C-alpha cells in the first residue's frame, strides 16, 4: 500500500515557535508510519522555509527536529517548493503567522489540503476581540471586558476599565496565544504596565474581568459534523497559568475527565460546539472555559491549533474518549482533505 505524504510545518515567526517545535516532535512520533511518510519544514523567525528531515518510520527517542541551532540559512527554499501532489500539510504552528489565517491562505493558494481551520475562522479566532464580539451575538457567555487599540485615547480606555471592571483584571494582546504577553493587574498602576507589555506583542489589547474560577477545556473535532470531548480541568500549582508555567516549569496537572456535574459537562460541550460553528470552524479546536463556584460558565477562548505535545490537553482529551493520538492525526488528515475537496468544488 502506498503511503500518503504528511508535510509538517513547524517553528514560525511568532513568540510561540518553541511550543510549535515541541508539538511537531510529538506529532512526528505519533504518526502511523504504515499510512504516512513525513516530510518536515522549519520556518525560521525571519520567515524562511528550510527543508529539514524525512521520516518513513517512527524516529528514535533521541532524534530531534532541526531548529535555529541546527539549520543553515543557506538551505532556505522557496516557500512554494513545499508543494507535493497528493500530500496533506499539518501546519503545527502557533500564534501570529501560524494560526491567524496567513499560512492557511498560502496553502490554499498552492492548492494543498491542510489540517485545521480555514482562513476566515483562523483569523477571527486568533483575534480575541473579534472572537468576543462574534460570540456575544451567538449568545455564548463570556466575562466582562474592555478594549484598547493603540493610537486611541489611553486615558479614556483606562477610565472605562475602572468604571466597568473591578480588579484584578487580565490584560492580553488580542492576537497571541499560549499566554504570551498576558499579565494580571491588581491596581491602576499595574494595569498601565500590563498594557505597555501587551503592546509589545500587538496593537489591539483586550482587558478582561478576572474571576475566581476553575479552568475547564473541551476538545472539538469535525467539519459539518462537530464532535466534542468530555471536559478536562487544568489543575495549577501557580496563581496564573502563564507561558512559563505551561511549557517550561511544568507546574500544572490535568484532571480528565473534569470533576463537574453532568449538566455542567453537557452545557460546556454545547457551548463549545456553538462557538466553533459561530466562528466557522473546521478540523479542530480546543475551547477553554471558566467555571465559578456558583456554577457560572464563561467561555475564555477558542484555540484553533491547540498544543499538540504528548502532555497537551487536546490529545489527552481525545484519548479519554477512546481516540488515540495516532488516530487523531488520521482523522485530522481526512477532515483536511474533505475541506479541500469542498473548497475546490465551490470554485466550479
From Swiss-Prot:
Reaction(s) catalysed (UniProt annotation): 2 D-alanine + ATP = D-alanyl-D-alanine + ADP + phosphate + H(+)
Enzyme Commission no: 6.3.2.4
Domain ATP-grasp, residue spans: 132-334
Name of the coding gene: ddl
Record GO cellular component, one term: cytosol
Keyword Ligase: yes
Cofactor: Mg(2+); Mn(2+)
EC category name: ligase
Signal peptide: none
Protein name: D-alanine--D-alanine ligase
Record key words, sorted: ATP-binding, Cell shape, Cell wall biogenesis/degradation, Cytoplasm, Ligase, Magnesium, Manganese, Metal-binding, Nucleotide-binding, Peptidoglycan synthesis
Keyword ATP-binding: yes
Upper classification of the organism: Bacteria, Bacillati, Bacillota, Bacilli, Lactobacillales
Positions with a binding annotation for Mg(2+) 1: 288, 301
Pathway: Cell wall biogenesis; peptidoglycan biosynthesis
Residues binding ATP: 162-217
A single MF term (Gene Ontology): ATP binding
UniProt organism field: Streptococcus thermophilus (strain CNRZ 1066)
Binding site for Mg(2+) 2: 301, 303
Cofactor info, note text: Binds 2 magnesium or manganese ions per subunit.
Single GO biological process annotation from the record: regulation of cell shape
Task performed by this protein: Cell wall formation.
Subcellular location: Cytoplasm
Entry similarity comment: Belongs to the D-alanine--D-alanine ligase family.
